[in-house]
A protein has these predicted regions:
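Conserved acetyl-CoA-binding loop-helix of GNAT-fold acetyltransferases
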Residues: 82, 88-101, 120, 124-128
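Conserved catalytic-core motifs of GNAT/GCN5-like acyltransferases
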Residues: 112-115, 127, 132-148
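Positions that flank functional sites
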Residues: 42, 118, 141
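Acetyl-CoA-dependent GNAT
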Residues: 4-85, 96-98, 102, 106, ...
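Acyl-donor (CoA/ACP) binding surface of acyl/acetyltransferases
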Residues: 89, 93, 137-138, 146-148, ...
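Conserved hydrophobic/aromatic "anchor" residues
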Residues: 31, 64, 86, 125, ...
Length: 158
């Protein structure tokens, strides 16, 4: 594997089992149990219109972005996660840029996502890449946790 390069996860890849295992570890560590896709991960990846990009560095998966395109016009970033020790090194931005590029090749008109307003580094990253806050969705994650719904239109320069 190339160091620090964003790679698309493919089931046919020899690295598939190792990458999935590492992504699952990241998922369980970063996201609360009720937000984790760990139980439905294979189901999510098995969907026809979904993808996962990951970044490999220092002999491990440093982070990943998962997305889907439920229609020909809309894509949804479902997860973006970077291991704590690899944060603030540009990996999250590289993953997000790669996902945006992938969506644009499919002529997606809008990319949306949800983010906890208290996760200001994530909110700032999304804003840096042109995402705009559409609305506040109350009780999105839990009774006491809201989310910003954010979007990026395809005509935005990234």
């Amino acid at each position: 594997m190339d160091e620090g390069v964003v790679v698309e996860l493919k089931k046919s890849s020899a690295d598939y089992p190792m990458v999935v295992e590492e992504v699952m570890r990241i998922e369980k560590k970063i996201f609360p149990k009720h937000e984790s896709l760990s139980r439905s991960f294979d189901e999510e990846l098995g969907k026809k219109n979904s993808g996962l990009l990951y970044i490999y560095t220092s002999g491990e998966v440093a982070g990943y972005v998962m997305f889907s395109w439920p229609s020909s016009l809309l894509a949804v970033i479902t997860k973006l996660a970077v291991k704590e020790k690899h944060r603030r090194q540009g990996y999250g931005e590289a993953l997000l840029r790669a996902a945006i590029k992938k969506c644009k090749t499919r002529n997606i008109q809008r990319i949306s996502l949800h983010v906890d307003p208290s996760r200001s580094p994530a909110v700032n990253l999304y804003k840096k890449l042109g995402f705009r806050i559409d609305s506040l969705v109350e009780k999105y994650y839990a009774a006491d946790r809201d989310a910003y719904r954010m979007y990026l239109d395809s005509d935005a320069d990234v």
